[in-house]
Amino acid sequence: LGFEGAPSTQNFSAHAEVPFLNGGVGLNVVKDAVGQFSNLGLQASYAYRMQLGIGQIGMGMSFGVFQSGLDGSNFTPASQGDNAIPTGMVDGSKLDLGAGVYYNTQDMYLGFSSAHMTEPIVEWSDGKQYPLKRHYFLIAGYTYDLTSNLLLHPSMYLKSDGATSQMDINTNLIYENMWGGVSYRLDEGIILLAGLEINKDLKFGAAYDVTLMNPMGNSFEVILEYNF
């Protein structure tokens, strides 16, 4: 927020249970843009679920395409003839794989997954290469009953590429059909969260990211979920 070329992300996902496959299928589309750079990911997934102890475990894989590009038409190089800066749009795409495992009970959940498992290298149309590093994700959460209609939901999210890491520590209060909370992203900022269950099928949420160390500035996120 607040300056031209600020980072923006759009994410669309859908999933459905398929009983005869003993699991479910999903579709995920993510589009990112930062300045003149843009990424587009399209993933289809399948997860197998089975009973394990007092909960269920799911194991799945995703398969899709990752596209990245750079629009050099709006760059103003310090010197003419800089071959490192394209004069127009360059892009490329590559097959992409992911996998994960997820366990949940009535009160808790724990999940681990990996993206860009094969570390694909996207070759742009000008011959330059855009490598994708393998990423690892860990999530965990628990729900406490404070009263008959008030729940406390602490959770954590860890993302790492093996060299750098990002960790979020979250706390949400859920009251009937409303929720609100705060998330702390280590060494980066605070995220304020709020949401409303409009009816049994439709949910709306919003988040405001207040950055402490990042020069990119604050950001705003809107989430809309519909269950068919």
Language-model regions, residue ranges each:
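Subset of outer-membrane beta-barrel
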Residues: L1-F228
